[in-house]
């Protein structure tokens, strides 16, 4: 792992160590367990799809390592509100500071501004981050197979579910998919962007579809830029999408969501 992902994970390990010194895991766990406000993330996606619509996880991110700043005029609450009005099923909020210019506060503000369930989008490598996700109000956490050993994936999934959250497991290739299929979560994200090179191809989702059993909800991630991309995926029975960049670059992200999903 000699690449962008490795660099990010090294920073995450430092961040977790620092956070633990500021606040004990036991104290954070008490706060997370005291929250009784989980919104059903997987259910929100299924509800949209049952209505014949796309289940869109609409992302809130200011910047990315590959593209730099995506949105100068960045107001997480306003973006969340327009996403909700224009039919998003859920939100994804970047909480990574160094690489995506995100924050915990962005997640809190976005969630407070609308009724949608929220994914904490970050590079989770430690139970502390899962507990922190629930404490800040997240309804779902992202686990990236490329970043974690199978035993870690199982441990973190179990913890997230014990705290009432859903889990989105993300894969990029057939080897990672095999590992992900051993987890309990029905939410299977296929990232069309290679996290090692940051290149994107929608073919990635289509190539992996034949290997995915019934009972898993496929969410195609990255590279969905046009209504044609959406139609292509839906013609292959992929009805859930995680979209960020296309919305962030638009004048009104919610209006762009409605346009993209037709």
From Swiss-Prot:
- Example of a GO MF term: indole-3-glycerol-phosphate synthase activity
Reaction equation(s) it catalyzes: 1-(2-carboxyphenylamino)-1-deoxy-D-ribulose 5-phosphate + H(+) = (1S,2R)-1-C-(indol-3-yl)glycerol 3-phosphate + CO2 + H2O
Record carries keyword S-adenosyl-L-methionine = no
Biological processes annotated in GO? L-tryptophan biosynthetic process
Q: Which UniProt keywords apply?
A: Amino-acid biosynthesis, Aromatic amino acid biosynthesis, Decarboxylase, Lyase, Tryptophan biosynthesis
Cross-referenced Pfam families, in alphabetical order? IGPS (PF00218)
Which PROSITE patterns does the record match to this protein? IGPS
Q: Does the keyword Ubl conjugation apply?
A: no
Biological or metabolic pathway of the protein: Amino-acid biosynthesis; L-tryptophan biosynthesis; L-tryptophan from chorismate: step 4/5
**SUPFAM superfamilies (alphabetical):** Ribulose-phoshate binding barrel (SSF51366)
Q: Which InterPro entries match?
A: Aldolase_TIM (IPR013785), Indole-3-glycerol_P_synth (IPR045186), Indole-3-glycerol_P_synth_dom (IPR013798), Indole-3-GlycerolPSynthase_CS (IPR001468), RibuloseP-bd_barrel (IPR011060)
Question: Coiled-coil region(s) at which residues?
Answer: none
Catalytic class of the enzyme: lyase
User: EC number(s) on record?
Assistant: 4.1.1.48
Entry's family note: Belongs to the TrpC family.
Report the protein name in the record.
Indole-3-glycerol phosphate synthase
Which organism is this entry from?
Answer: Bordetella petrii (strain ATCC BAA-461 / DSM 12804 / CCUG 43448)
Give the lineage: Bacteria, Pseudomonadati, Pseudomonadota, Betaproteobacteria, Burkholderiales
Record gene name: trpC
